[in-house]
Regions:
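Long, compositionally biased, glycine/small-hydrophobic-enriched stretches that function as flexible linkers
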Residues: 1-224
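Small-residue-enriched flexible segments
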Residues: 185-186, 191-284
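Gly/Ser/Thr-rich loops at beta-strand to alpha-helix junctions
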Residues: 204-206, 313-322, 344-346
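A general structural motif
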Residues: 284-300
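Structural motif
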Residues: 308-309
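Short Gly/Thr/Asp-enriched flexible loops that form oxyanion-binding sites at enzyme active sites
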Residues: 319-331
């Protein structure tokens, strides 16, 4: 599978018609974008605001941050399962706007978790997003729309806006292109023998924080509560197959789109290791299911990917520690070394 990520640097963002990118400046026709968002009858009105670094602005009730991206080619391939047709993500060309993001706010959420982004002062200096220009989207639900339905509408509004902005750069020169290509059928005999094969175990969900007992959709627009350990191509993660849930408690979508561990394993591929592939898994509340998950994850790492070692990450704290430790232990019993654990916290 081969993914070509075409990055375009955005130096300024302002309202203007038509929506376009000219000389690294992004112009957005807010009236047109509002019409795109309000096609969803679950949203009554929406407020769009540009927040630039240094402005005395604090964005509150933040539930996700999304990088503007779109597939280059036929429309309908973006964020499959959410916007696009259900297909495997991770191949072809994807356009990406750098230095700008879509920020989703949901002031109507009754959940305990949301975030804020400061555009000035100490908060901006400490934030990953203090130096990024943002399009803040603040929707209002239509009468009679339930809380969970509105959450899905908010997510869709953000994804639509991300694609809308990225498509505006269709005629703009690309600043740099990154190619992510990995043949998962390659085995040790096909690669330099001196290099260890390293897999990645990505725990992407835990049920302990399910709101109202209902899991959020995060994989191809679907929830993963009962998901058994599954092989995915790392390009799927980078290309919109995985999104954040309906709060910022998980990794935000922007971070997943630029997953630092996946990109680092790619960077080191065929230099000091062979990137063997990715196994995704979930945490469980049931002890027997935990053992089952760990056993199956270790089998995929060992037998399907023929990995010599595995890097593991978890989601949230508390219970997921146990699940991750069991996966690491099962990998060790299979003769595969858990190289490290990286804790991606909210």
């Amino acid at each position: 599978m081969r993914l070509q990520l075409e990055r375009i640097d955005i130096k300024a963002f302002c309202a203007g018609s038509p929506t376009r990118v000219s000389d690294h400046v992004l112009y957005a026709d807010f009236s047109e974008l509002e019409r795109v968002i309000l096609k969803d009858d679950r949203i009554r009105t929406v407020r769009l605001t540009i927040a630039s670094p240094g402005e005395r602005i604090r964005i509150v009730n933040v539930v996700d941050v999304i990088q503007p991206r779109c597939k280059v080619g036929p429309e309908g391939w973006d964020f499959p399962g959410w916007l696009g047709k259900l297909r495997i993500a991770g191949d072809g060309r994807t356009r990406s706007l750098e230095g700008v993001s879509v920020v989703l706010s949901n002031r109507y959420s009754k959940r305990s978790y949301s975030a804020l982004i400061d555009m000035f002062g100490t908060g901006a200096e400490m934030s990953r997003y203090g130096a990024t220009t943002h399009l803040s989207i603040d929707p209002v639900p239509a009468n009679g729309v339930g809380e969970r339905e509105f959450e899905r509408a908010v997510k869709l509004a953000g994804l639509k806006a991300a694609v809308y902005l990225a498509r505006a750069a269709g005629q703009h020169p690309v600043d740099r292109t990154e190619v992510y290509e990995l043949n998962l059928a390659e085995r040790s005999g096909d690669s330099p023998s001196r290099l260890p094969r390293v897999a990645y175990y990505y725990q992407l969900y835990t049920p302990q924080h399910d709101y109202q007992g209902i899991p959020d959709p995060i994989l191809y627009g679907s929830e993963v509560k009962g998901l058994l350990p599954t092989l995915v191509h790392p390009n799927e993660i980078l290309d919109g197959a995985v999104t954040s849930g309906h709060t910022i408690r998980e990794l935000d979508t922007y971070t997943i789109q630029n997953h630092p561990l996946v990109r680092e394993l790619y960077r080191r591929h065929r230099k000091d290791l062979i990137f063997a592939g990715v196994v995704i898994g979930v945490a469980s509340l049931e002890p027997v299911q935990r053992e089952r998950m760990a056993m199956m994850a270790a089998s995929l790492v060992s037998n399907a990917l023929a990995a010599d070692g595995v890097v593991l990450t978890k989601t949230h704290g508390g219970m997921p520690h146990v699940d991750l430790a069991l996966v690491a232990e099962a990998c060790e019993h299979a003769g595969r070394r858990p190289y490290s654990s990286s804790w991606f916290m909210e």
